[in-house]
Swiss-Prot record:
<dbReference type="InterPro" id="IPR015424">
    <property type="entry name" value="PyrdxlP-dep_Trfase"/>
</dbReference>
<keyword id="KW-0554">One-carbon metabolism</keyword>
<feature type="binding site">
    <location>
        <begin position="354"/>
        <end position="356"/>
    </location>
    <ligand>
        <name>(6S)-5,6,7,8-tetrahydrofolate</name>
    </ligand>
</feature>
<comment type="pathway">
    <text>Amino-acid biosynthesis; glycine biosynthesis; glycine from L-serine: step 1/1.</text>
</comment>
<feature type="modified residue" description="N6-(pyridoxal phosphate)lysine">
    <location>
        <position position="229"/>
    </location>
</feature>
<dbReference type="InterPro" id="IPR049943">
    <property type="entry name" value="Ser_HO-MeTrfase-like"/>
</dbReference>
<dbReference type="GO" id="GO:0030170">
    <property type="term" value="F:pyridoxal phosphate binding"/>
</dbReference>
<comment type="subunit">
    <text>Homodimer.</text>
</comment>
<dbReference type="GO" id="GO:0005829">
    <property type="term" value="C:cytosol"/>
</dbReference>
<feature type="site" description="Plays an important role in substrate specificity">
    <location>
        <position position="228"/>
    </location>
</feature>
<dbReference type="InterPro" id="IPR001085">
    <property type="entry name" value="Ser_HO-MeTrfase"/>
</dbReference>
<keyword id="KW-0963">Cytoplasm</keyword>
<protein>
    <recommendedName>
        <fullName>Serine hydroxymethyltransferase</fullName>
        <ecNumber>2.1.2.1</ecNumber>
    </recommendedName>
</protein>
<dbReference type="InterPro" id="IPR019798">
    <property type="entry name" value="Ser_HO-MeTrfase_PLP_BS"/>
</dbReference>
<keyword id="KW-0663">Pyridoxal phosphate</keyword>
<dbReference type="GO" id="GO:0019264">
    <property type="term" value="P:glycine biosynthetic process from serine"/>
</dbReference>
<comment type="function">
    <text>Catalyzes the reversible interconversion of serine and glycine with tetrahydrofolate (THF) serving as the one-carbon carrier. This reaction serves as the major source of one-carbon groups required for the biosynthesis of purines, thymidylate, methionine, and other important biomolecules. Also exhibits THF-independent aldolase activity toward beta-hydroxyamino acids, producing glycine and aldehydes, via a retro-aldol mechanism.</text>
</comment>
Length: 417
């Protein structure tokens, strides 16, 4: 029998670290584009007794007994995911976005097959063919990028590379791209060479669910996403697809037993909650505000003389190039962090610096919008960022901004006390 004691009583060292992180989230402004704050209901599911249950297999086809209630939970998540995104197929078992992506590769490709994906240096993701990832090591990865004049995806280059290399799969999606992706253009290119089209919409899934960003699910052969970021659920993954019995069977077996063992049932339950939350009327208003906030911040920073890659944003994020100011992303990250503004350093197209230093930062608005910030607050925030960057990290300026950050964080708490 377990002793009925708290973490603080049993493990004060760990408890203190958790307490400190709770305080940090309340006292810092979160602008990392891939982060958000999930609801208390999502966290309740994550911390439930479901964490005790093993459930290898799928609803009605388990390798373990005692799964009758787990089956209900997983089926709820599946049905809600399909309804939310207009999908014919959903697999809610992937532990994370990268695991969802690796399952797609396993399902549709053989080692050595050619894949065409977006370059990490131009806004793609590790799993889109980067040399340091399984996707670039196991497969012959060809990379496309942005048009240097427009800062947008160079679809002519995508088509040229596709016709030249004949990839078996084209990957569309991004981790740092601020414009609307033309999913149909990718479909047309893929069809010219008989390739699969795989879309990774991890960053914009919440926007897609709310109808404020184009939905790729019925255009692509397979679509994946994380369930956090803009979707505002648990840190986990999801695979979606339009009707295709052959692909569905391959995806099922690629997730289990091909890529994973049993699902994390507590995370599956949390996904079911997050999908239901995304069906609420207020969710669309939230996602619309996310985009408005990102656009407002980009406008202010452009007015202050900073370069935004592709000239602005039509989603939840943008890349700020600091090449003109001769500021490294690493320094900008540190200076802003000292003022309790959390961003991440990020490479920009044709970046002369290494990925560990970079010449830019990535800014996203999902978390601050969850917190309740509107355009007035984020315009102030963008001005504070510019103040710190203009001063090259002057301590007095950082302290002045930090005081303003503390005041606005107190006004807009993440979670009710």
């Amino acid at each position: 029998m377990f002793a009925n004691i708290s973490i603080a009583e049993f493990d004060p060292e760990l408890a203190q670290a958790i307490t400190n992180e709770d305080a940090r989230q309340e006292a810092h402004i979160e602008l990392i584009a891939s982060e958000n704050y999930c609801s208390p209901a999502v966290m309740e599911a994550q911390g439930s007794k479901l964490t005790n249950k093993y459930a290898e297999g799928y609803p009605g086809k388990r390798y373990y007994g005692g799964c009758e209630y787990v089956d209900i939970i997983e089926q709820l998540a599946i049905d809600r995911a399909k309804e939310l995104f207009g999908a014919d197929y959903a697999n809610v078992q992937p532990h994370a976005g990268s695991q969802a992506n690796s399952a797609v590769y396993l399902a549709l490709l053989n080692p050595g097959d050619t894949v065409l994906g977006m370059s990490l240096a131009h806004g793609g993701h590790l799993t889109h063919g980067a040399k340091v990832s399984f996707s670039g090591k196991t497969y012959n990865a060809i990379q496309y990028g942005l048009n240097p004049e427009t800062g947008e995806i160079d679809y002519e280059e995508v088509e040229r590379l596709a016709l030249e290399h004949k990839p078996r799969m084209i990957v569309a999606g991004f981790s740092a791209y601020s414009q609307i992706v033309d999913w149909q253009r990718f479909r047309d290119i893929a069809d010219k060479i008989g390739a699969y089209l795989f879309v990774d919409m991890a960053h914009v899934a919440g926007l897609v669910a709310a109808g404020v960003y184009p939905n790729p699910v019925q255009i692509a052969d397979v679509t994946t996403t994380t369930t956090h970021k803009t979707l505002r659920g648990p840190r986990s993954g999801l695979i979606l697809a339009k009707a295709n019995e052959e692909i569905e069977k391959k995806l099922q077996s690629a997730v289990f037993p091909g890529n994973q063992g049993g699902p994390l049932v507590h995370a599956v339950a949390a996904k079911a909650i997050c999908f239901k939350e995304a069906m609420a009327p207020e969710y669309k208003a939230y996602q619309q505000q996310v985009v408005k906030n990102a656009q407002a911040m980009a406008e202010v920073l452009i007015e202050r003389g900073y370069d935004v890659v592709s000239g602005g944003t039509k989603n939840h994020l943008f890349l700020l190039s600091l090449i003109k100011q001769d500021i490294t992303g690493k320094d900008a990250d540190a200076w802003l962090g000292a003022a309790h503004i959390t961003v991440n350093k990020n490479s920009v197209p044709n970046d002369p610096r290494s990925p560990f230093v970079t010449s830019g930062i990535r800014i996203g608005t999902p978390a601050v919008t969850t917190r309740g910030f509107g355009e007035a607050e984020v315009r102030d925030l963008a001005s504070w960022i510019a103040d710190i960057l203009d001063s090259k990290g002057d301590e007095a300026v950082i302290n002045t901004v930090k005081a303003k950050v503390e005041a606005v964080c107190a006004k807009f708490p993440v979670y009710a006390k």
